[in-house]
Amino acid sequence: MFLVRDIMYCKPGNARPMVQKFQALSKLLQQMGMGSMRVMTDVSAERYWTVVAETDVKSLEEFTEMSRTASARKEFQDVMKGYHDLIDQGRREIYMLET
């Protein structure tokens, strides 16, 4: 099992719109049978206006296929349209779950 964590450092005032995009994306992934995401905002973090989305996957191959399948769908493209305007930068972390 792996945990995939997408960390977005939003521009001031844009954390809520990014949360809404991740929430809509989570619903879309659930409809596609791909599980749900945990969406979090910072209380205290490295930077203000941080939004984190986490997904558990069985394998990196599953994650790669899930990403390809979702990103090819118009619904996904509509949900994520304009998200670059909301963020300064972002990064992805992938962890192997040991327990």
Model-flagged regions — what are they?
Residues 3-8:
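Active-site-flanking beta-strand signature of metal-NTP-handling nucleotidyl enzymes
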Residues 20-38, 54-93:
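An amphipathic, aromatic/His-enriched active-site/gating alpha helix that lines ligand/cofactor pockets
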